[in-house]
A protein has these predicted regions:
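Generic recognition of long tandem-repeat/solenoid scaffolds
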Residues: 72-75, 82, 133-135, 166-175
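Bacterial N-terminal signal peptides that target proteins for export
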Residues: 2-11
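Long, charged/polar, surface-exposed segments that mediate recognition or autoinhibition
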Residues: 80-150
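Bacterial N-terminal signal peptides
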Residues: 10-18
Length: 176
């Protein structure tokens, strides 16, 4: 092999990777945080993405920092994540509740709310199984409920839980 062949190969590989990323759909917090997803509208493209994303990453048990710009293939489509700090995967078994989630950590402000995490989850609560997604919002559930009303989203249709850190978990159940 000539000395220039490995260089040509690496250059070709780099161009192929850049082309793949250029063809990929960009997913950022602005794509995923909107009135539709905050209101648990399950027919939205974003809800479908969160469901597919969870399923794809669940197989790989992915946990990673520095995920921005990385290419992910989910159901034959390529995605590049931007604006997220990390992907985390966790499995919790506590008091007959089994919770498994894959979350995207971020610090994103929209609609006068600070979104800290977007996660897809599956939960088994004493035999009752649920699947969906949730947001962690920096603020108490009462304040989050007021902001939802201001946005025209009825809080009685949402599950707002207080986290151990005093924030709000806005939970949307897709199946269950």
């Amino acid at each position: 092999m000539k000395p220039t062949q490995p260089l040509k190969f690496l250059l070709g590989l780099a161009i192929t990777c850049l082309f793949s990323i250029a063809q990929a759909k960009i997913i950022n917090p602005n794509n995923l945080v909107n009135k539709s997803t905050l209101g648990c509208n399950f027919s939205s493209e974003q809800s479908v993405f969160l469901s597919d994303f969870y399923g794809a990453l669940l197989k790989d048990k992915v946990a990673s920092k520095n995920i921005s710009g990385r290419l992910y293939t989910i159901k034959d489509s390529d995605y590049v994540l931007q604006g997220f700090y990390s992907i985390g995967h966790n499995f919790i078994h506590k008091d007959k509740i089994i919770l498994e989630y894959t979350g995207l950590d971020l610090n994103f402000k929209k609609f006068n709310m600070n979104i800290l995490r977007i996660a897809a989850f599956s939960e088994n609560d004493n035999g009752d199984e649920n699947f969906g997604y949730y947001f962690i919002i920096r603020d108490m559930p009462e304040k989050t409920s007021q902001r939802m009303r201001y946005l025209g989203i009825e809080p009685q249709n949402l599950i707002l839980e207080k986290t151990s850190a005093g924030n709000t978990r806005l939970k949307c159940i897709l199946v269950g």
